[in-house]
Amino acid sequence: MKIKNTVQFTLIALFLISGALPGFAQAKNGFVKIFNGTDFEGWHLKIRSDDAELAKKVYAIEDGMVHVFKDFPKEYELNTGDNATHGLFYTNKKYSKYILKFEYKWGVGIANNFDQFQYDAGCYYHVADDKIWPLGIEYQVRYDHTQKKNHTGDFWAGGLKWYSKDGNSFLLPSEGGQPVLGHGGEHLAAPDVKSNALNGKWNKCEVIVMGDKYTIHKLNGKIVNMATELPYSEGIIGFQSETAEIYYRNIQIKEFDEIIPMENFLK
């Protein structure tokens, strides 16, 4: 019996060390997957129509991803003004100081008010409510194919201090960017950062936010936007369905107990 118990203990120890337990396996370099790839445990779905069954179809799960507008027609309710499937899937938990990572790629389907905002989606954070157009800060995910212009990494928010040289697009302070106050709505990300648009390839996105002190947007490893003196210090996180088929995957977060100086991430 003693030998048997020793063997069992050894096997359990090896099991734990190898990270075979699901909760342990999710963590890597301090990051934890907040979308488990199989269901929406820890999340809730919200669309304009308040149709729970339709929301489940909008946010389909396949192969560990959220596939927005998976089985919808290639042109769904296009430019009707209804926009019933505008919405987000939201975390139940609030977050304050963290690094959020996620990946996305575009599909081929288009929907809703596509002619107005082409290939449009996004990630909202520091959200104070769970409305369709919430109070919070948006990491814009968008590609305007009519101008071949990427908007991923733009801010949609007001009441924050942004940095720009020409008042048009973001520029790092170390490169001449100056504080801009009172700039509401869209704050354009740095131009000419490499991204994948309609080629079926993935983009890697990152939000580094420390309470109401600052936020940094990264796209494919490059800093594309930054702001300080934020209007919110915490909130839930949501990912949008808006005007085009999109895939989200590898949604993970690393939380911090204390504020990490912004300079640590600008090196």
What are these model-predicted stretches?
Residues 1-27:
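Bacterial Sec-dependent N-terminal signal peptides
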